[in-house]
Amino acid sequence: MSESGQEQNRGTNTSPNNAENNNNSNAASGPLNGGAEQTRNITVSIQYSYFTPERLAHLSNISNNDNNENNSAASGSTIANGTGPSFGIGNGGHQPDGALVLSFRDVPASTPQDRLNSFISVAAQLAMERFNRLLNRPKGISKDEFDKLPVLQVSDLPKAEGPLCSICYDEYEDEVDSTKAKRKRDSENEEESEGTKKRKDNEGAPLRTTADNDSNPSITNATVVEPPSIPLTEQQRTLNDEETNPSYKHSPIKLPCGHIFGRECIYKWSRLENSCPLCRQKISESVGVQRAAQQDTDEVAANEAAFERIRRVLYDPTAVNSTNENSSAPSENTSNTTVPTIGNASSGEQMLSRTGFFLVPQNGQPLHNPVRLPPNDSDRNGVNGPSSTTQNPPSNSGGSNNNQSPRWVPIPLTLFQFHSPNPNPSASDSSASPSAANGPNSNNTSSDATDPHHNRLRAVLDHIFNVAQRGTSDTSATTAPGAQTVHNQGRNDSSSSDTTQGSSFLENISRLTGHFTNGSRDNNNDNNHSNDQQRGGSTGENNRNNLFSSGVASYRNQNGDVTTVELRNNNSAAFPPTDENPSQGQGSSSSDTTIHNDVPNDNNEQRSSQ
């Protein structure tokens, strides 16, 4: 998901003479036109796209393209001119699938940048919660609709059904008559209510008697004691549990389609699905309208709560004052980030864009605990990478950052570099990533590529997607001989190896989703074959030697002869003799002659020749 925020100034002086005041954060906070407060209109567009293996592969190809440097420079100039950012995820990406647009009018121009970042974070959280509700909508039926289904007796079951439930294969049992159970519960409630009434009457009479008799305070103290309310609380809790999680017996129940299941089993199924487990016919036709109305009500309530938070962020003066007190410390780390200005702009419209990944939690849990901005300067440098196309929230140093409201921290696309950094210092300027070359600290590309924070980010992502971390070890760590050979081959070979390692993330995504399994295996086989050819076949033979360290191998030829050899870390012993070189098969070890005693016909001639 990508965020694109649009700010339009109203009432500000946009003449070219005041262009030098763009970097002054207090330029728009002063009064204008006789003390009137400056305001602006803010429009935030939350653009979203659906990630598929094909699109992830397309994004990986774009990130590895050498033309990203020119594209990022052109995009940076476009944003500076106020014509808007490029749509899609990353430069040259596809058009977004949709957008959630929020517009707010008459926002005070003196609103600090931290408040605007919080506003964008709340808008992004609103969009993510809406996606959660769309993806995790309940599909089951209510308890009232389930109770309308007819319950059968075991004796009334057709002979074709049998006495077993087709879901759990347990025997059916007759359900207790609901009318009798209801009468029993009503009688118990009446008896309990009568007992409570008698207890209250008995407690009230001594109380009136002892009120006139002041000479015996001990009796008064004994009659003032109130009855315990534990039974009523437990009874109410039991009723609530029975309504939410009712207990049914394994009585046969008939669905509208005619299939019969156990009542307990089909109730658990109906809480999740409104269809028959066998034929997928709907169980209840009126559930869709009721569920849609309930979902609309919940969505309206959630939107109102989010809009109230945004209103407090933008228009509440007390919140603005508290934010100004918390953010009184000056910002120090502004060299690695491009912070959009709040003051007078050279044009009447200013655009800011941020691009990042957001992870949707499982089981539809709400996103109430966003990620906090790291307080350390080193962590901020690791998150806010040097990039001219992605603009992240400003990082204010100091201890006051811990008191600020939590916010989303988008991960820039430029940090998703799964290839190993180029160790050659002479080629660092040309082989470095475009995002690092475009940053203000482009002279330290080699040190940024080997930054431990990048390695830590790579390790976290590898742990999430169960990808073996390759190419991120320190210089002191020991590596395989084959990896050292590829590491020292030069610039041409390093580009191909980087592409192979960069695709591991996409291949694992495809493996998790069940797509392109055969294609990824074929690619891996081709890559291994090409690497073996470049290394003189040493790697393939080493893998064969390490495949089986010891054991016995048997081979049967076309004539029916069986040859058995022992595997003793010898590659030649693992392969059976061929018909073209019969002398090699006859010159096997002594163990072959002892095993071939039971082989008829042709093998006898071989033993005689030996």
From Swiss-Prot:
Keywords: Metal-binding, Zinc, Zinc-finger. Transmembrane segments: none annotated. Residues 11-36, 384-406, 425-447, 493-502 have a biased composition (Low complexity). GO terms for cellular component: cytoplasm; nucleus; peroxisome. Disulfide bonds: none annotated. Residues 1-36, 176-231, 318-348, 360-453, 471-502, 514-554, 569-610 are annotated as: Disordered. Plays a specific role in mating-type regulation of yeast, by acting post-translationally to control the stability or activity of the SIR4 proteins. This is Protein SAN1. It comes from Saccharomyces cerevisiae (strain ATCC 204508 / S288c) (Baker's yeast).
